[in-house]
């Protein structure tokens, strides 16, 4: 199947799914349809392990959106589809390049659209295809367009067809056609220019032989002076961090407990400080081990201090993790506290990868290439799991459970709240939840969100 055929097919699918509908089950179906067509179209040589994993995650993301219909599942579909399209074109390019290439494709869309010779067939079309265009598609387009114009200009003309109860919103049809074509064109006509392969060279995970030659970074510092600056800096920072860890843990676990508001403020400030410290720590390692120091036999002290610096930062993260856990036990779960866990876990992963970078003599790009997949994994986990339900189930066990807060601010908590209402005999809460659920369940099939159908 050619690109232009896929563009027309998926544009028609988009219009069919979204005409007269709001976003819901239809978007999940669209995502799965794109994934299946991509699998069908992609040449066997590009169907490697990464491509097949991305195919599965794209389908699962589509299912997640059909189930929840929220922003994070939309983001999961968006990122998964871009990566799938990218890997269907090249198996060797780093996935980190997918987003920049996608943005370039969006910007250059007007130019690429008018390059008809690149995406429309230049040879003579088959007889059947010509008949389809000449007898069906072109006449149908003009009939629909002029029918809408004449109906708007004459009530009597429109009334001729009222017995058929035929309603047609031309502008919605036209807008959906344009949007569907824009999406389909940029997906199927996904172009990777030559300069991208130059970027890919800069994102290599391993050093080339010429990168291993010992040379100073700056002209005003020779190699010995630069090495010494690294040793002094990292030694001083290790001492400073060790003192900070001691005071940090004393303030968190030894001092007299404070009021909830004060404790909340201090906890968030400390976690922010930890995250910033981790970013700076990784930045320090990247700065000193960006090149020849990875292969400098005289840089053993520098490497030991760097690894010590990484280990101490892991200890700092674990301290913050324990404090956040204590905070959750004392005051319950929220989205923000779950977010803190996510950031701290990503921080530990980043530090472990930094340790591997130093130990295995990897490039700085190695860190970014690997962390990209972990961030993508976090998006997938956030989209697949009902975190609102987990938060509500956890907090329901508390004596100070705030029903209204979870009713308004925590998403997808209705099933847990119905259980709570049943246990407490709260008929008012039960009726409110069911009334809201019934209004959502009344939507047309393609506009439904599957989760709403489970609320009974």
Stretches with model-predicted labels:
Residues 1-3, 44-50, 116-129, 159, ...:
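Juxtamembrane membrane-water interface segments of multi-pass membrane proteins
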Residues 15-155, 176-198:
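Transmembrane-helix bundle segments that line or gate the permeation/cavity pathway
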Residues 145-160, 243-258, 318-325, 391-392:
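Membrane-helix interface motif
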Residues 163-176, 260-277, 334-344:
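Short aromatic-rich membrane-water interface segments that cap or initiate transmembrane helices
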Residues 308-357:
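Membrane-embedded alpha-helical segments of integral membrane proteins
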Residues 364-388:
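Internal/C-terminal transmembrane anchor helices
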Residues 380-404:
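Hydrophobic alpha-helical transmembrane segments in integral membrane proteins
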Residues 407-456:
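Extracytosolic and intramembrane catalytic regions of membrane-associated proteins
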